[in-house]
Amino acid sequence: MTEKRKGEGDKLLYCSFCGKSQHEVRKLIAGPSVYICDECVELCNDIIREEIREISPKRDGSELPTPHEIRAHLDDYVIGQEYAKKVLAVAVYNHYKRLRNSSEAGGVELGKSNILLIGPTGSGKTLLAETLARLLDVPFTMADATTLTEAGYVGEDVENIIQKLLQKCDYDVEKAQRGIVYIDEIDKISRKSDNPSITRDVSGEGVQQALLKLIEGTIASVPPQGGRKHPQQEFLQVDTSKILFICGGAFAGLDKVIEQRSVKGTGIGFGADVKSKNARATLSENFAKVEPEDLIKYGLIPEFIGRLPVVATLTELDEAALIQILKEPKNALTKQYAALFDLEGVELEFRDDALNAIAHKAMERKTGARGLRSIVEAVLLDTMYDLPSLEGVSKVVIDETVIKGDSAPLMIYENPESQAAVSE
Protein backbone atom coordinates (compact mmCIF):
# COMPACT_ATOMS: atom_id res chain seq x y z
CA MET A 1 0.00 0.00 0.00
CA THR A 2 1.36 3.44 -0.87
CA GLU A 3 -1.18 5.42 1.14
CA LYS A 4 -2.98 4.87 4.41
CA ARG A 5 -5.75 6.78 6.12
CA LYS A 6 -4.42 9.09 8.80
CA GLY A 7 -7.70 10.65 9.77
CA GLU A 8 -10.81 11.79 8.04
CA GLY A 9 -9.79 13.00 4.60
CA ASP A 10 -6.03 12.95 5.39
CA LYS A 11 -3.76 10.53 3.54
CA LEU A 12 -0.31 9.51 4.75
CA LEU A 13 1.91 8.63 1.76
CA TYR A 14 4.51 5.84 1.82
CA CYS A 15 7.41 4.85 -0.43
CA SER A 16 6.40 1.88 -2.58
CA PHE A 17 9.93 0.40 -2.29
CA CYS A 18 11.11 0.77 1.31
CA GLY A 19 7.78 1.49 3.02
CA LYS A 20 8.95 4.68 4.79
CA SER A 21 6.36 7.41 5.31
CA GLN A 22 6.61 10.88 3.83
CA HIS A 23 7.66 12.20 7.25
CA GLU A 24 10.65 9.83 7.48
CA VAL A 25 12.26 10.94 4.22
CA ARG A 26 13.26 14.27 2.66
CA LYS A 27 11.35 13.85 -0.61
CA LEU A 28 8.69 11.53 -1.95
CA ILE A 29 8.32 11.44 -5.76
CA ALA A 30 4.93 10.44 -7.15
CA GLY A 31 4.32 8.20 -10.15
CA PRO A 32 1.19 6.54 -11.53
CA SER A 33 -0.23 5.14 -8.26
CA VAL A 34 3.32 4.59 -6.85
CA TYR A 35 5.82 6.65 -4.84
CA ILE A 36 9.58 6.52 -4.44
CA CYS A 37 11.65 8.31 -1.78
CA ASP A 38 14.97 10.16 -2.24
CA GLU A 39 16.85 7.42 -0.33
CA CYS A 40 15.69 4.71 -2.75
CA VAL A 41 16.58 6.93 -5.74
CA GLU A 42 20.12 7.31 -4.33
CA LEU A 43 20.37 3.54 -3.78
CA CYS A 44 19.24 2.86 -7.38
CA ASN A 45 21.89 5.30 -8.65
CA ASP A 46 24.59 3.47 -6.69
CA ILE A 47 23.50 0.09 -8.11
CA ILE A 48 23.51 1.41 -11.70
CA ARG A 49 26.91 3.11 -11.27
CA GLU A 50 28.41 -0.11 -9.90
CA GLU A 51 27.04 -2.19 -12.80
CA ILE A 52 28.28 0.30 -15.42
CA ARG A 53 31.75 0.22 -13.86
CA GLU A 54 31.80 -3.59 -13.97
CA ILE A 55 30.70 -3.90 -17.59
CA SER A 56 32.66 -0.89 -18.94
CA PRO A 57 35.10 -2.09 -21.62
CA LYS A 58 38.74 -2.30 -20.56
CA ARG A 59 41.27 -0.27 -22.52
CA ASP A 60 43.11 -2.55 -24.88
CA GLY A 61 46.61 -2.34 -26.27
CA SER A 62 45.43 -0.61 -29.45
CA GLU A 63 44.61 2.51 -27.40
CA LEU A 64 48.14 2.80 -26.05
CA PRO A 65 49.76 5.88 -27.63
CA THR A 66 53.04 5.35 -29.46
CA PRO A 67 56.28 6.95 -28.18
CA HIS A 68 55.92 9.63 -30.89
CA GLU A 69 52.38 10.45 -29.71
CA ILE A 70 53.48 10.52 -26.06
CA ARG A 71 56.34 12.87 -26.96
CA ALA A 72 54.00 15.12 -28.97
CA HIS A 73 51.61 15.36 -26.00
CA LEU A 74 54.47 16.25 -23.66
CA ASP A 75 55.56 18.96 -26.12
CA ASP A 76 52.16 20.66 -25.65
CA TYR A 77 52.80 21.20 -21.95
CA VAL A 78 56.56 21.00 -21.32
CA ILE A 79 59.10 23.26 -23.03
CA GLY A 80 62.56 21.86 -23.82
CA GLN A 81 63.91 18.70 -22.12
CA GLU A 82 63.92 16.81 -25.45
CA TYR A 83 66.12 13.96 -24.22
CA ALA A 84 64.07 13.42 -21.05
CA LYS A 85 60.84 13.39 -23.08
CA LYS A 86 62.19 10.74 -25.44
CA VAL A 87 63.43 8.54 -22.56
CA LEU A 88 60.09 8.86 -20.74
CA ALA A 89 58.03 8.18 -23.88
CA VAL A 90 59.88 4.91 -24.58
CA ALA A 91 59.91 3.77 -20.93
CA VAL A 92 56.21 4.46 -20.40
CA TYR A 93 55.23 2.83 -23.71
CA ASN A 94 57.23 -0.31 -22.87
CA HIS A 95 55.81 -0.46 -19.34
CA TYR A 96 52.16 -0.40 -20.43
CA LYS A 97 52.84 -2.67 -23.42
CA ARG A 98 54.33 -5.14 -20.92
CA LEU A 99 51.16 -4.98 -18.79
CA ARG A 100 48.76 -5.38 -21.69
CA ASN A 101 50.61 -8.18 -23.44
CA SER A 102 52.19 -10.09 -20.55
CA SER A 103 50.44 -13.30 -21.59
CA GLU A 104 51.81 -13.06 -25.15
CA ALA A 105 55.49 -12.64 -24.27
CA GLY A 106 56.24 -16.26 -25.14
CA GLY A 107 57.21 -17.28 -21.61
CA VAL A 108 59.75 -14.45 -21.31
CA GLU A 109 59.25 -12.39 -18.18
CA LEU A 110 59.55 -8.73 -19.10
CA GLY A 111 61.38 -6.57 -16.55
CA LYS A 112 59.98 -3.42 -14.99
CA SER A 113 61.28 -0.05 -16.17
CA ASN A 114 61.01 2.38 -13.27
CA ILE A 115 62.40 5.84 -13.99
CA LEU A 116 64.80 8.19 -12.20
CA LEU A 117 64.58 11.87 -13.19
CA ILE A 118 67.60 14.00 -12.33
CA GLY A 119 67.36 17.73 -12.86
CA PRO A 120 67.64 21.10 -11.13
CA THR A 121 64.73 22.73 -9.29
CA GLY A 122 61.98 24.00 -11.58
CA SER A 123 63.13 22.10 -14.67
CA GLY A 124 59.84 20.20 -15.15
CA LYS A 125 60.27 16.81 -13.41
CA THR A 126 56.88 16.85 -11.66
CA LEU A 127 55.10 18.35 -14.67
CA LEU A 128 56.38 15.57 -16.94
CA ALA A 129 55.02 12.87 -14.58
CA GLU A 130 51.65 14.62 -14.17
CA THR A 131 51.27 15.12 -17.93
CA LEU A 132 52.01 11.45 -18.61
CA ALA A 133 49.36 10.29 -16.13
CA ARG A 134 46.79 12.65 -17.66
CA LEU A 135 47.51 11.39 -21.19
CA LEU A 136 47.27 7.72 -20.22
CA ASP A 137 44.17 8.29 -18.04
CA VAL A 138 45.61 6.32 -15.12
CA PRO A 139 45.57 7.09 -11.37
CA PHE A 140 48.45 9.32 -10.33
CA THR A 141 49.79 10.21 -6.91
CA MET A 142 52.76 12.17 -5.63
CA ALA A 143 54.78 11.38 -2.53
CA ASP A 144 57.43 13.45 -0.80
CA ALA A 145 60.42 11.29 0.11
CA THR A 146 61.40 13.68 2.92
CA THR A 147 58.28 12.72 4.92
CA LEU A 148 58.93 8.96 4.66
CA THR A 149 60.49 6.96 7.50
CA GLU A 150 60.98 3.29 8.27
CA ALA A 151 57.95 1.46 9.67
CA GLY A 152 57.57 2.00 13.40
CA TYR A 153 59.04 5.52 13.44
CA VAL A 154 57.30 8.90 13.46
CA GLY A 155 56.51 9.86 9.87
CA GLU A 156 54.83 8.24 6.87
CA ASP A 157 55.35 4.55 6.09
CA VAL A 158 56.10 3.66 2.48
CA GLU A 159 52.78 1.75 2.36
CA ASN A 160 51.02 5.14 2.63
CA ILE A 161 52.12 5.83 -0.96
CA ILE A 162 49.98 2.94 -2.23
CA GLN A 163 47.11 4.01 0.02
CA LYS A 164 47.17 7.49 -1.56
CA LEU A 165 47.06 5.88 -5.01
CA LEU A 166 44.04 3.79 -3.97
CA GLN A 167 42.27 6.89 -2.67
CA LYS A 168 42.69 8.52 -6.11
CA CYS A 169 40.68 5.72 -7.75
CA ASP A 170 38.08 5.07 -5.01
CA TYR A 171 39.94 1.99 -3.74
CA ASP A 172 39.61 0.17 -7.08
CA VAL A 173 42.61 -2.20 -6.78
CA GLU A 174 42.62 -3.17 -10.47
CA LYS A 175 42.76 0.47 -11.52
CA ALA A 176 45.40 1.37 -8.91
CA GLN A 177 47.68 -1.41 -10.19
CA ARG A 178 47.93 0.41 -13.54
CA GLY A 179 48.74 3.75 -11.92
CA ILE A 180 51.82 5.97 -11.76
CA VAL A 181 53.54 6.98 -8.52
CA TYR A 182 55.88 9.98 -8.52
CA ILE A 183 58.25 10.16 -5.54
CA ASP A 184 59.73 13.65 -5.30
CA GLU A 185 62.88 14.76 -3.44
CA ILE A 186 64.34 11.26 -3.76
CA ASP A 187 67.84 12.73 -3.34
CA LYS A 188 66.94 13.74 0.23
CA ILE A 189 66.91 10.09 1.36
CA SER A 190 70.52 9.54 0.34
CA ARG A 191 72.81 8.00 2.93
CA LYS A 192 74.20 10.68 5.21
CA SER A 193 77.82 9.51 4.73
CA ASP A 194 79.82 7.03 2.66
CA ASN A 195 80.52 4.87 5.70
CA PRO A 196 77.74 2.85 7.36
CA SER A 197 76.93 4.39 10.74
CA ILE A 198 76.24 2.65 14.04
CA THR A 199 73.22 4.89 14.62
CA ARG A 200 70.09 4.04 12.63
CA ASP A 201 69.39 6.30 9.65
CA VAL A 202 65.57 6.03 9.63
CA SER A 203 64.93 8.76 7.05
CA GLY A 204 67.85 8.03 4.69
CA GLU A 205 69.17 4.56 3.94
CA GLY A 206 66.34 3.04 6.01
CA VAL A 207 63.74 4.51 3.65
CA GLN A 208 65.69 3.31 0.61
CA GLN A 209 65.60 -0.23 2.03
CA ALA A 210 61.86 0.07 2.70
CA LEU A 211 61.19 1.32 -0.84
CA LEU A 212 63.18 -1.48 -2.52
CA LYS A 213 60.48 -4.16 -2.57
CA LEU A 214 57.69 -1.67 -3.20
CA ILE A 215 59.38 -0.31 -6.33
CA GLU A 216 60.57 -3.68 -7.62
CA GLY A 217 57.21 -5.34 -7.12
CA THR A 218 55.54 -6.93 -4.13
CA ILE A 219 52.08 -7.65 -2.80
CA ALA A 220 51.44 -4.71 -0.49
CA SER A 221 48.77 -5.05 2.20
CA VAL A 222 46.96 -1.75 2.52
CA PRO A 223 44.11 -0.95 4.93
CA PRO A 224 41.04 0.06 2.88
CA GLN A 225 39.78 3.18 4.65
CA GLY A 226 40.55 4.53 8.08
CA GLY A 227 43.97 2.82 8.31
CA ARG A 228 44.99 1.47 11.69
CA LYS A 229 41.93 3.01 13.38
CA HIS A 230 39.87 0.07 12.11
CA PRO A 231 42.08 -3.03 12.49
CA GLN A 232 39.11 -5.36 11.98
CA GLN A 233 38.84 -4.40 8.29
CA GLU A 234 40.31 -6.75 5.70
CA PHE A 235 43.48 -5.44 4.06
CA LEU A 236 43.56 -4.85 0.30
CA GLN A 237 46.24 -6.74 -1.62
CA VAL A 238 47.93 -4.53 -4.24
CA ASP A 239 50.49 -5.92 -6.71
CA THR A 240 53.06 -3.11 -7.06
CA SER A 241 54.90 -4.87 -9.92
CA LYS A 242 52.32 -3.33 -12.28
CA ILE A 243 52.68 0.21 -10.91
CA LEU A 244 55.11 2.55 -12.67
CA PHE A 245 57.36 4.38 -10.19
CA ILE A 246 59.01 7.63 -11.25
CA CYS A 247 61.51 9.10 -8.79
CA GLY A 248 62.78 12.64 -9.14
CA GLY A 249 65.25 14.89 -7.39
CA ALA A 250 67.43 17.96 -7.83
CA PHE A 251 70.55 16.10 -6.55
CA ALA A 252 72.34 19.26 -5.43
CA GLY A 253 76.09 18.59 -5.41
CA LEU A 254 75.91 15.55 -7.72
CA ASP A 255 77.55 17.59 -10.50
CA LYS A 256 80.66 17.96 -8.32
CA VAL A 257 80.76 14.18 -7.74
CA ILE A 258 80.56 13.61 -11.52
CA GLU A 259 83.23 16.25 -12.15
CA GLN A 260 85.60 14.64 -9.64
CA ARG A 261 85.23 11.30 -11.43
CA SER A 262 85.66 12.91 -14.86
CA VAL A 263 88.90 14.73 -14.01
CA LYS A 264 90.38 11.83 -12.01
CA GLY A 265 93.55 10.51 -13.58
CA THR A 266 94.40 13.68 -15.52
CA GLY A 267 97.75 13.83 -13.70
CA ILE A 268 99.48 16.29 -11.43
CA GLY A 269 102.46 18.61 -11.74
CA PHE A 270 103.69 20.05 -15.04
CA GLY A 271 101.95 17.38 -17.13
CA ALA A 272 98.54 17.88 -15.52
CA ASP A 273 95.58 18.87 -17.64
CA VAL A 274 94.36 21.81 -15.53
CA LYS A 275 91.00 23.25 -16.56
CA SER A 276 90.23 26.91 -16.05
CA LYS A 277 87.06 27.97 -14.25
CA ASN A 278 85.43 28.94 -17.55
CA ALA A 279 86.30 25.60 -19.17
CA ARG A 280 84.49 23.57 -16.51
CA ALA A 281 81.37 21.72 -17.55
CA THR A 282 77.97 23.23 -16.78
CA LEU A 283 75.47 21.56 -14.44
CA SER A 284 73.49 20.15 -17.40
CA GLU A 285 76.65 18.79 -19.07
CA ASN A 286 77.71 17.06 -15.86
CA PHE A 287 74.25 15.56 -15.27
CA ALA A 288 74.30 14.15 -18.82
CA LYS A 289 77.42 12.11 -17.88
CA VAL A 290 75.94 10.58 -14.70
CA GLU A 291 76.85 6.94 -13.97
CA PRO A 292 75.50 4.56 -11.28
CA GLU A 293 78.80 4.89 -9.37
CA ASP A 294 78.17 8.65 -9.04
CA LEU A 295 74.75 8.03 -7.50
CA ILE A 296 76.27 5.48 -5.09
CA LYS A 297 78.90 8.01 -4.03
CA TYR A 298 76.13 10.57 -3.60
CA GLY A 299 74.41 8.29 -1.07
CA LEU A 300 71.95 6.01 -2.89
CA ILE A 301 72.47 2.32 -2.15
CA PRO A 302 73.34 0.06 -5.14
CA GLU A 303 70.18 -2.06 -4.73
CA PHE A 304 68.00 1.06 -4.94
CA ILE A 305 69.74 2.32 -8.09
CA GLY A 306 69.27 -1.14 -9.63
CA ARG A 307 65.49 -0.79 -9.23
CA LEU A 308 65.54 2.42 -11.31
CA PRO A 309 67.11 1.24 -14.59
CA VAL A 310 65.89 4.17 -16.72
CA VAL A 311 67.70 7.42 -15.92
CA ALA A 312 66.63 10.67 -17.61
CA THR A 313 68.53 13.88 -16.97
CA LEU A 314 66.92 17.29 -17.36
CA THR A 315 68.81 20.41 -18.35
CA GLU A 316 68.81 23.80 -16.67
CA LEU A 317 66.29 26.15 -18.25
CA ASP A 318 67.79 29.26 -19.82
CA GLU A 319 66.08 32.64 -20.23
CA ALA A 320 64.77 31.82 -23.71
CA ALA A 321 63.14 28.60 -22.42
CA LEU A 322 61.48 30.49 -19.55
CA ILE A 323 60.01 33.00 -22.02
CA GLN A 324 58.61 30.08 -24.05
CA ILE A 325 57.16 28.53 -20.87
CA LEU A 326 55.38 31.81 -20.13
CA LYS A 327 53.50 31.91 -23.43
CA GLU A 328 53.63 28.68 -25.48
CA PRO A 329 52.25 25.63 -23.57
CA LYS A 330 48.50 24.94 -23.59
CA ASN A 331 48.33 25.90 -19.92
CA ALA A 332 50.96 28.67 -20.12
CA LEU A 333 51.03 31.10 -17.21
CA THR A 334 50.08 34.13 -19.31
CA LYS A 335 47.11 32.18 -20.76
CA GLN A 336 45.97 31.23 -17.25
CA TYR A 337 45.99 34.82 -16.00
CA ALA A 338 44.38 36.05 -19.23
CA ALA A 339 41.53 33.56 -18.65
CA LEU A 340 41.24 34.75 -15.03
CA PHE A 341 40.94 38.40 -16.14
CA ASP A 342 38.51 37.37 -18.89
CA LEU A 343 36.10 36.21 -16.17
CA GLU A 344 35.99 39.89 -15.10
CA GLY A 345 35.39 40.91 -18.73
CA VAL A 346 38.88 42.42 -19.00
CA GLU A 347 41.60 41.66 -21.56
CA LEU A 348 45.11 41.11 -20.14
CA GLU A 349 48.14 41.77 -22.35
CA PHE A 350 51.77 40.94 -21.53
CA ARG A 351 54.20 42.78 -23.80
CA ASP A 352 57.36 41.01 -24.97
CA ASP A 353 59.64 43.17 -22.84
CA ALA A 354 57.57 42.17 -19.78
CA LEU A 355 58.09 38.47 -20.53
CA ASN A 356 61.83 39.08 -20.90
CA ALA A 357 61.91 40.87 -17.54
CA ILE A 358 59.96 38.07 -15.78
CA ALA A 359 62.31 35.41 -17.20
CA HIS A 360 65.37 37.48 -16.22
CA LYS A 361 64.10 37.86 -12.65
CA ALA A 362 63.44 34.08 -12.40
CA MET A 363 66.99 33.38 -13.62
CA GLU A 364 68.39 35.67 -10.93
CA ARG A 365 66.40 33.82 -8.26
CA LYS A 366 67.61 30.44 -9.60
CA THR A 367 64.14 28.92 -9.11
CA GLY A 368 63.57 27.75 -12.69
CA ALA A 369 60.02 27.63 -14.06
CA ARG A 370 58.61 27.21 -10.55
CA GLY A 371 59.48 30.83 -9.70
CA LEU A 372 57.58 32.33 -12.64
CA ARG A 373 54.14 32.16 -10.99
CA SER A 374 55.25 33.94 -7.81
CA ILE A 375 56.72 36.80 -9.88
CA VAL A 376 53.57 37.23 -11.99
CA GLU A 377 51.33 36.89 -8.92
CA ALA A 378 53.23 39.65 -7.09
CA VAL A 379 53.05 41.96 -10.13
CA LEU A 380 49.29 41.48 -10.61
CA LEU A 381 48.30 41.44 -6.92
CA ASP A 382 47.16 45.09 -6.65
CA THR A 383 45.41 44.94 -10.02
CA MET A 384 43.48 41.78 -9.09
CA TYR A 385 42.58 43.41 -5.75
CA ASP A 386 41.21 46.62 -7.31
CA LEU A 387 39.74 45.33 -10.59
CA PRO A 388 36.43 43.89 -9.25
CA SER A 389 35.65 47.32 -7.70
CA LEU A 390 36.45 49.31 -10.85
CA GLU A 391 33.96 49.94 -13.64
CA GLY A 392 34.60 50.35 -17.34
CA VAL A 393 38.07 48.74 -17.49
CA SER A 394 38.43 46.91 -20.81
CA LYS A 395 42.15 46.08 -20.88
CA VAL A 396 45.20 45.80 -18.61
CA VAL A 397 48.68 46.07 -20.15
CA ILE A 398 51.86 44.81 -18.46
CA ASP A 399 55.26 45.99 -19.71
CA GLU A 400 58.86 45.85 -18.50
CA THR A 401 58.52 48.87 -16.17
CA VAL A 402 55.69 47.12 -14.29
CA ILE A 403 57.82 44.01 -13.71
CA LYS A 404 60.71 46.14 -12.44
CA GLY A 405 58.36 47.99 -10.08
CA ASP A 406 58.84 51.39 -11.75
CA SER A 407 55.17 51.83 -12.71
CA ALA A 408 51.69 50.39 -12.22
CA PRO A 409 49.92 48.30 -14.89
CA LEU A 410 48.28 50.40 -17.61
CA MET A 411 44.47 50.24 -17.41
CA ILE A 412 42.50 51.06 -20.55
CA TYR A 413 38.86 52.08 -20.07
CA GLU A 414 35.93 51.64 -22.46
CA ASN A 415 34.92 55.25 -21.86
CA PRO A 416 37.67 57.79 -22.76
CA GLU A 417 36.31 60.17 -20.10
CA SER A 418 36.96 57.60 -17.35
CA GLN A 419 40.50 57.14 -18.72
CA ALA A 420 41.11 60.89 -18.56
CA ALA A 421 39.75 61.11 -15.00
CA VAL A 422 42.08 58.33 -13.83
CA SER A 423 45.08 59.95 -15.57
CA GLU A 424 44.42 63.18 -13.70
From Swiss-Prot:
Which is an annotated Pfam family here?
AAA_2
Every copy of the ClpX-type ZB domain together lies at 3-56
Binding positions for ATP per the UniProt entry: P120, T121, G122, S123, G124, K125, T126, L127
InterPro entries xrefs: AAA+_ATPase (IPR003593), ATP-dep_Clp_protease_ClpX (IPR050052), ATPase_AAA_core (IPR003959), Clp_ATPase_C (IPR019489), Clp_protease_ATP-bd_su_ClpX (IPR004487), ClpX_bact (IPR046425), P-loop_NTPase (IPR027417), Znf_CppX_C4 (IPR010603)
Instruction: Tell whether Repeat is among the UniProt keywords.
Output: no
| Residue positions binding Zn(2+) | C15, C18, C37, C40
Query: Which Gene Ontology terms of cellular component type are present?
Result: HslUV protease complex
Instruction: Quote the CDD domains the UniProt record gives.
Output: RecA-like_ClpX
Domain of life of the organism encoding this protein: Bacteria
Question: What molecular function terms (GO) are annotated for this protein?
Answer: ATP binding; ATP hydrolysis activity; ATP-dependent protein folding chaperone; protein dimerization activity; unfolded protein binding; zinc ion binding
Q: Which GO terms describe its biological process?
A: cell division; proteolysis involved in protein catabolic process
**Keyword Nucleotide-binding annotated:** yes
- What Gene3D superfamilies does the annotation carry? 1.10.8.60, ClpX chaperone, C4-type zinc finger domain (6.20.220.10), P-loop containing nucleotide triphosphate hydrolases (3.40.50.300)
What are the protein's UniProt keywords? ATP-binding, Chaperone, Metal-binding, Nucleotide-binding, Zinc
The entry's family comment says: Belongs to the ClpX chaperone family.
Protein role: ATP-dependent specificity component of the Clp protease. It directs the protease to specific substrates. Can perform chaperone functions in the absence of ClpP.
Q: Sorted alphabetically, which PANTHER family does this protein's record hold?
A: ATP-DEPENDENT CLP PROTEASE ATP-BINDING SUBUNIT CLPX-LIKE, MITOCHONDRIAL, ATP-DEPENDENT CLP PROTEASE ATP-BINDING SUBUNIT CLPX-LIKE, MITOCHONDRIAL-RELATED
Q: Which NCBIfam families match?
A: clpX (TIGR00382), PRK05342.1 (NF003745)
Query: Subunit notes for this chain?
Result: Component of the ClpX-ClpP complex. Forms a hexameric ring that, in the presence of ATP, binds to fourteen ClpP subunits assembled into a disk-like structure with a central cavity, resembling the structure of eukaryotic proteasomes.
Protein's recorded name: ATP-dependent Clp protease ATP-binding subunit ClpX
